[in-house]
C-alpha cells in the first residue's frame, strides 16, 4: 500500500549543543521533542563540502534547497569564484581589464560594494580582498569600498572584526568610502525608501557622515543599532560620479538586485527619483538579473 510522503523544510532548524544564541534549544517545541524522544530523528550534514561549499563554511537556506532539490552535491558559485581568485584569473577578465583601462584614461574611481562579513551566505572576505587586489594589480589607483555590515548571518555586533580584517588587507589607494547596515542597500522586498538611504551615502555622499569606519560602528552601538540596521554613513570621497566604475562583490543575487537596478536602469518600477551617474562599467561577481 502506497502512502503519501510530505517533505517539510524548516529553515533555521538545526542541531547544536550550545544554548547561547540558539533559538532551537530555547524554544517550546513539544512535537519535535516527542519525535526526538521516540527516536524518530536523524541528521544530515548541511555545511562545507557536503553541500558544495568550502570546507568549514556554514550552509544556508538557498544552498540547502538547491542540494535537496538536485538530489546531489552541487558546487556553489562561491567555490567557483574562490578558485578563480586563487588561480590568479580574476585580473585577467576582459570586462575588468577594460574598466581599468578606461579609469586610467579618465582618472575615475572604482567603487566596490559588498557585504563585509564572515557569514559566507552572500559574500566572502577572501572575495572582497581578492577583488581589491585584482583591481590594484591592474593599475587602478583609486578604489572606494562601500562596506555593508551584516548582523543577520553573523552575530549582531561583530562588524568590527570584519571591518578591521578588510582594512588591514586593502591595497594602496583603496579606502572605505561608506558604511551602513545591509537592511538598507540589500533590501529585496521593494521597500525603496530603505535603498534610497543607502543611495544617499554611497552614490551621493550625503546624509550621515563619519570620520572612519570604527567611529561609525562605535556611534551606532552607542545608539542601540546592531550591524544589520546601522544607518548608512558617508566617510570619504565624493560618491559615485560620472566616469566611475562599480563592481558588486556579493555572489548571491537576491539582495543586490534592487540596488544594482537603481544604479543601471532608468525605468525601474517603484524606484525613487534619482540621477544615475554615467558609469563606464558596472560589474558583478554573478548575474544579478
Explain the meaning of each model-derived region.
Residues 4-10, 247-250:
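Short, hydrophobic/glycine-enriched beta-strand segments
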Residues 13, 253-254:
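Short glycine-rich anion-binding loops that position phosphate/pyrophosphate groups of nucleotides
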Amino acid at each position: 500500500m502506497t502512502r503519501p510522503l510530505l517533505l517539510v523544510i524548516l529553515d533555521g532548524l538545526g542541531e547544536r549543543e550550545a544554548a547561547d544564541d540558539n533559538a532551537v534549544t530555547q524554544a517550546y517545541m513539544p512535537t519535535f521533542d516527542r519525535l526526538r524522544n521516540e527516536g524518530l530523528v536523524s541528521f544530515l550534514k548541511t555545511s562545507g563540502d557536503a553541500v558544495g561549499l568550502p570546507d568549514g563554511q556554514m550552509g544556508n537556506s538557498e544552498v540547502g534547497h538547491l542540494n535537496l532539490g538536485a538530489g546531489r552535491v552541487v558546487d556553489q558559485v562561491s567555490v567557483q569564484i574562490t578558485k578563480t581568485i586563487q588561480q590568479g584569473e580574476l585580473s585577467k577578465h576582459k570586462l575588468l581589464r577594460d574598466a581599468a583601462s578606461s579609469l586610467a584614461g579618465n582618472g575615475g574611481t572604482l567603487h566596490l560594494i559588498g557585504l563585509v562579513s564572515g557569514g559566507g551566505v552572500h559574500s566572502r572576505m577572501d572575495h572582497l580582498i581578492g577583488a581589491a587586489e585584482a583591481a590594484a594589480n591592474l593599475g587602478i589607483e583609486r578604489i572606494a569600498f562601500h562596506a555593508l555590515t551584516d548582523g543577520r548571518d553573523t552575530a549582531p555586533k561583530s562588524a568590527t572584526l570584519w571591518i578591521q580584517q578588510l582594512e588591514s588587507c586593502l591595497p594602496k589607494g583603496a579606502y572605505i568610502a561608506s558604511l551602513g547596515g545591509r537592511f538598507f542597500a540589500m533590501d529585496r522586498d521593494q521597500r525603496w525608501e530603505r535603498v534610497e538611504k543607502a543611495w544617499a551615502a554611497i552614490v551621493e555622499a550625503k546624509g550621515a557622515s563619519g570620520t572612519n569606519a570604527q567611529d561609525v560602528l562605535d556611534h551606532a552601538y552607542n545608539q542601540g543599532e546592531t550591524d544589520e540596521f546601522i544607518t548608512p554613513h558617508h566617510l570619504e570621497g565624493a560618491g559615485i560620479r560620472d566616469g566611475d566604475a562599480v563592481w558588486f562583490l556579493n555572489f548571491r543575487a537576491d539582495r543586490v538586485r534592487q540596488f544594482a537596478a537603481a544604479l543601471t536602469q532608468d525605468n525601474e518600477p517603484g524606484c525613487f527619483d534619482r540621477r544615475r551617474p554615467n558609469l563606464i562599467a558596472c560589474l558583478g561577481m554573478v548575474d544579478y538579473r
